[in-house]
Amino acid sequence: MAVGKNKRISKGKKGGKKKASDPFAKKDWYDIKAPTMFTVRNVGKTLVTRTQGTKIASEALKGRVFEVSLADLQKNEDDAFRKMRLRVEDVQGRNCLTNFWGMDFTTDKLRSLVRKWQTLIEAHVDVKTTDGYTLRVFCISFTKKRQGQIKRTCYAQSAQIRQIRKKMMEIITREATSCDLKELVAKFIPESIGKDIEKSCQGIYPLQNTFIRKVKVLKAPKFDITKLMEVHGDYSEEVGAKIERPAAAAPAVEEAATA
């Protein structure tokens, strides 16, 4: 008879089955706060693993980027095609304080603008704001028929396109370099730069659907808590707020101290 292990007989595993732990039990929810330039300040919530040893929860949250529709931030459905990127700069209590980190268009809006019989003109330029942010701003525009035009097409000549592109870059540079990031975002929301471009290019060729299509943050200045607090105006006031004590309670406290 052959002596050896019988492989068919399965042994019971050591320790038995491990208890399935809930991964959410070790996590916490944090509120995402948008800057004061937007109407809605509470953007949503984000999950993070609780502080354990050297792994600190607030450090894991810093640098997170959230993409939010401008329609949700401004309570205006007409702005639904614009996406805002917000980056967590600091964590205070259970609040993640964010700042502007870029802007983009939804794909469906961009596709709906491109049509036949017109010229698409694009331009991009790198600008630096007064508070030290380096941004790359992309602009898009389309030609339109002149008043009373019967001809089906409205194509611009190469020389006209170059002139329009130059004008675009001049206006974007002028608007961006004369203000800080907060003021610049306030210009992006109502599309005031696009309207300025259409107005100034009227003499070269009539334009329509002129938008700041995309904004990238290339370089940000060194983190400054005071500047972040300016963007999130209401938080600095809450810290160390003076509590007024009732007049009757004050003498009672003094008597207790002397006794």
UniProtKB/Swiss-Prot annotation:
It is found in: Cytoplasm. Keywords: Cytoplasm, Ribonucleoprotein, Ribosomal protein. Coiled coil: none annotated. Residues 1-22 are annotated as: Disordered. InterPro entries: Ribosomal_eS1, Ribosomal_eS1_CS, Ribosomal_eS1_euk. One of its GO terms (molecular function) is structural constituent of ribosome. One of its GO terms (biological process) is translation. GO terms for cellular component: cytosolic small ribosomal subunit. It comes from the Eukaryota. It holds the Pfam family Ribosomal_S3Ae. Residues 1-18 have a biased composition (Basic residues). Belongs to the eukaryotic ribosomal protein eS1 family. HAMAP family: Ribosomal_eS1_euk (MF_03122). Component of the small ribosomal subunit. Mature ribosomes consist of a small (40S) and a large (60S) subunit. The 40S subunit contains about 33 different proteins and 1 molecule of RNA (18S). The 60S subunit contains about 49 different proteins and 3 molecules of RNA (25S, 5.8S and 5S). This is Small ribosomal subunit protein eS1.
